[in-house]
């Protein structure tokens, strides 16, 4: 099963933490939030996750690259949005990602 992880937002409610760190990489108990999510997705046998990015995309790209190289239980792919599209917009422009899936998260 595949999943969308909507991580492109500005994280305004988490400021000042998100002035320099994207919200999906804010540390919780010493680990980025994205690492906690990956643990959950692995437990639920998600095979591939599309992560949308916009604000501070480079640290997220680095996380994706390192995760794919070291853990790799779930394949992570990025979809960069030059302009934020909202939840529905992200799913719409990436519908081919789940085209042959019966279900997706």
Q: Where are the regions that the model predicts?
A:
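Conserved N-terminal catalytic core of the sugar/cofactor nucleotidyltransferase
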Residues: 2-5, 27-105
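Short glycine/proline- and charge-enriched loop/turn segments
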Residues: 18-20, 75-76
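Pre-signature/interface helix of ABC/ABC-like ATPase nucleotide-binding domains
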Residues: 15, 23-26
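N-terminal nucleotide-binding beta1-loop-alpha1 segment
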Residues: 1-19, 44
């Amino acid at each position: 099963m595949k999943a969308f992880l909507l991580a492109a937002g500005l994280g305004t409610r988490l400021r000042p933490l998100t002035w320099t760190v994207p919200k999906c990489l804010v540390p919780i108990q010493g680990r980025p939030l994205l690492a906690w999510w990956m643990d959950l997705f692995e437990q639920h046998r998600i095979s591939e996750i599309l992560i949308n990015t916009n604000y501070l995309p480079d640290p997220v790209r680095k996380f994706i690259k390192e995760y794919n190289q070291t853990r790799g239980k779930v394949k992570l792919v990025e979809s960069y949005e030059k302009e934020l599209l909202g939840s529905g917009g992200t799913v719409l422009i990436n519908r081919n990602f789940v085209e042959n899936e019966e279900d997706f998260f």
